[in-house]
UniProtKB/Swiss-Prot annotation:
The gene is seqA. Its main location: cytoplasm. The keyword DNA-binding applies. It comes from the Bacteria. Homodimer. Polymerizes to form helical filaments. This is Negative modulator of initiation of replication. Transmembrane segments: none annotated. It comes from Shewanella halifaxensis (strain HAW-EB4). NCBIfam families: PRK11187.1. Pfam families: SeqA, SeqA_N.
Length: 186
C-alpha cells in the first residue's frame, strides 16, 4: 500500500463517489478510472506520518450541557428529541454528528450497544474505548459520544458521517423519511 497526499477538492471528489460503507479509496479510484476492482496484496508501510495527530494546546471551549430525561424503552422517533437550537449551536459537522449520536444514546441507552456492529470492510466506526479505534486506525480521530462511554471515529467526510448515522438510525427502527430528515441536519 502506498500513501499519497491529495488536495481538498480532489479528496472531496473521490469521497463523493463512495457507494457503500467500507469501500477503500483504491476501490473508488479503480471504479472511476475503469480499472478492474480486485483484491490487491497490500504491503504494510514501515512508518506512516500522522501530522493530524500532532497536538497544539487547544483553546478552552465552553460546552453547553443539555440534560433531558429519557426512558430506557426503545425509541424510533428521534426527530422530536433533537433540539434544533442546541443542534445549530454545535461546532461543525463533527459537533452535529456527535450531538445526534448522543441524543440517540440518551433515548435508548440499553440498546445503544448495537452500534458496535456497524463497521466498514476494513474500518471500525464505533468502540467502547478511544484506544480500540486508534488501534484499528491511527487516523481515526476518535471522539466520545457525550458521556456514553462509546466512541466514534470522526475523520470521515460529511457524506460518510451521514451514512454511518443512517445505519445507526435504521438499527433503531427509525423510518426512512425520518432518517433522511435527520441526516440532512449534519
Amino acid at each position: 500500500m502506498k500513501y499519497i497526499e491529495v488536495d481538498e477538492e480532489l479528496y472531496r471528489h473521490i469521497a463523493s463517489k463512495t457507494e457503500h460503507i467500507g469501500e477503500s479509496a483504491s476501490d473508488i479510484l479503480r471504479r472511476i478510472l475503469g480499472l478492474q476492482v480486485e483484491s490487491v496484496v497490500q504491503d504494510a508501510p514501515e512508518e506512516i506520518s500522522h501530522p493530524s495527530l500532532e497536538r497544539v494546546s487547544p483553546k478552552p471551549v465552553k460546552v453547553a450541557k443539555v440534560i433531558t430525561k429519557m426512558t430506557s424503552t426503545a425509541v424510533s422517533d428521534f426527530t422530536s428529541l433533537i433540539d434544533a437550537d442546541v443542534l445549530a449551536a454545535q461546532k461543525g459537522a463533527v459537533g452535529r454528528f456527535l450531538f445526534i449520536l448522543d441524543t440517540v444514546h440518551r433515548a435508548s441507552p440499553v440498546q445503544f450497544e448495537q452500534v458496535l456492529q456497524i463497521q466498514g470492510r476494513d474500518r471500525l466506526y464505533f468502540a467502547t474505548s478511544k484506544d480500540a479505534l486508534l488501534k484499528a486506525s491511527k487516523s481515526a480521530n476518535p471522539k466520545e459520544i457525550g458521556q456514553s462511554g462509546f466512541w466514534v471515529t470522526t475523520n470521515n467526510n460529511t457524506a460518510k458521517k451521514r451514512t454511518i448515522l443512517s445505519e445507526v438510525l435504521l438499527q433503531f427502527g427509525t423510518d426512512e423519511a425520518q432518517v433522511t430528515d435527520i441526516i440532512e441536519k449534519i
